[in-house]
Amino acid sequence: DLLVDEDAMVLALKKGKVKRYVSDFPNPTTAGAKGCIVIPHLGASTEEAEENCARMAVKEVRCYLEHGNIKNSVNYPDCDMGIPSYPARVAICHRNVKNMLSQFTTILGQANYNIGNMTNKSRGDYAYSMFDLESPASRELVEQLEAVDGVLKVRVIC
C-alpha cells in the first residue's frame, strides 16, 4: 500500500542516485536518513482533513465577509489588511489593468477622503484593492468607484 519502497529510497540516497527525498509520511526508515526532508502530513483524503478544510473555508469566507481579506482564493490573490481600524474599509474587485489605482485615489481625494491604509494585489487578469478611510464611505463615493471602467465589484466593509 506504500507509494515508495523506503528501504530502496534510503539506499538510493546513500549511493547518491537520489539527492533529496521529500515525504509527508515520516517513519523510522526515512525520518533520520541523510537527504530525507520530512514535512507535515496533510492527509488530504482523510475524513479529518475534509473536516479541517471545511472549517478553514468557513473561517476564510467569514474573514472576507467581515474584514474584506482574501486567503486561498483560486482567482484572486491573498490580500490581508487585518481587522479594520478606521471608520470605513472599501474593497474593490477589478481587472488588472493600468491606472486603476490612480483612478481610485483620484476619486477618493476629490471627494475629500483621506486614506489611512491601502493595499493592492493582483493575480493574472484580476486585482483586488482595499482602502481604509478616515471617514465613512458615502453611497455617492461607491457609485463613483463602480463607474470606473474595469471595476467588477465595490464593497463597503464597515
Question: Which stretches of residues belong to each language-model region?
Answer:
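A conserved regulatory-domain signal marking ACT and ACT-like small-molecule sensing domains
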Residues: 71-158
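Rossmann-like dinucleotide-binding domain for NAD(H)/NADP(H)
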Residues: 1-84, 128, 132, 158
